[in-house]
Amino acid sequence: MRWKGYDWEQHERWGMVHPEKPDWWYDPSASFIDSEDRLNLLTHKNPRYFSAIDKTSTIGVGLVSCKTKFKFGEFKIVAKLPYGKHLWPAFWMWSWDSWPPEIDVFEGYSDNNSNFFKFRLGKPFGFWNLQTNLHYTEDGKNKMMGGKTHYFGFKDPTKNWITYSVTWTKDFVEFYYDDKLVRKITEKKILEQLNQTTMNVIINNGVTADVDLINPPNSNFIIKDFVYNPF
């Protein structure tokens, strides 16, 4: 698939189904470019049998994986999140050399609220359940900074175009929602791992383990722009 000046695979670079998440698979029919040059990433019921894991995967999800090996710069999408229960859309990147490291610009968890609303007393303004995160290695073990939600206004992300971006330099990683800085990472041990590699950019729709496999949501994650500004 060619989109926004880049070539994209319509599945993860290692395959079409994750052996630890076999209820859904990366379905090429669930990712397409519409007449307005927008990327559409679906979730829909589309069973397919995979002999390697001896299981029929019930739900087809849209995922695109960019073939470019990216280094420092700003990575940005403008998107409307999918609407439905137990969805797991994401804009993220991971190393071409190993996993981790991984940078999650956001992972969205709709849970039982189809528009990703989640009120928490301890964080009354981070009420859209979209989380930044960063995975790394320490003492041979996979670790993460921890998922965090952030305030980016009262606009429903399933009804409004929101800009999600990350700026990656050798000295810091900054996350922005609608051009507002929401998180900054400066830990040297983490940056050293990132700075030694190149990153694979991925945009995907998805579902969580709690999804209804009998009647899964028919959802659409629409992305109208992807921009990379190298440094």
Protein language model regions, located:
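GH16 jelly-roll
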Residues: 1-231
